[in-house]
């Protein structure tokens, strides 16, 4: 975590949420499948629901936000590159993004 010292607080929190989600994703998906399966007994389904509720709050997929990996900005982020508008423009003009060229017609 020491190498991530340049990140702003919200970007750092988002990174932690992404890691937590990755750790608990399989467990969450399997318990959701059990909980949503109407053919299983009600007791088994309710136990699966309790296991889902016992997972950390930050491990939920809705906690993951689309933030710039350089600046931590939450708006104007290109999903394919994970960069906000201005860092994207700077890297594109410096030819540091593969496959991106300035348009000319």
Swiss-Prot record:
Subcellular location: Mitochondrion
Cited Gene3D superfamilies: 1.10.287.1480
GO function term, MF aspect, one: structural constituent of ribosome
A matching Pfam family: Ribosomal_S14
Domain of life: Eukaryota
UniProtKB keywords: Mitochondrion, Ribonucleoprotein, Ribosomal protein
A cellular component annotation (GO) from this entry: mitochondrion
Database matches in PANTHER family: 30S RIBOSOMAL PROTEIN S14, SMALL RIBOSOMAL SUBUNIT PROTEIN US14M
Assembly, per entry: Component of the mitochondrial small ribosomal subunit (mt-SSU). Mature yeast 74S mitochondrial ribosomes consist of a small (37S) and a large (54S) subunit. The 37S small subunit contains a 15S ribosomal RNA (15S mt-rRNA) and at least 32 different proteins. The 54S large subunit contains a 21S rRNA (21S mt-rRNA) and at least 45 different proteins.
Sequence similarity: Belongs to the universal ribosomal protein uS14 family.
Name of the protein: Small ribosomal subunit protein uS14m
Organism encoding this protein: Schizosaccharomyces pombe (strain 972 / ATCC 24843)
Name of the gene: mrp2
């Amino acid at each position: 975590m020491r190498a991530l010292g340049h990140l702003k607080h919200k970007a750092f929190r988002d990174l932690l949420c992404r890691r937590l989600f990755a750790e608990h994703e399989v467990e969450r998906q399997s318990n959701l499948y059990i909980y949503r399966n109407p053919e299983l007994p009600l007791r088994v389904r309710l136990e699966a629901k309790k296991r889902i509720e016992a997972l950390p709050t930050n491990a939920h997929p809705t906690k993951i936000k689309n933030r710039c990996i350089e600046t931590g900005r939450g708006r104007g982020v290109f999903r394919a590159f994970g960069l906000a508008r201005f860092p994207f423009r700077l890297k594109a003009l410096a030819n540091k993004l593969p496959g991106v060229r300035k348009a000319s017609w």
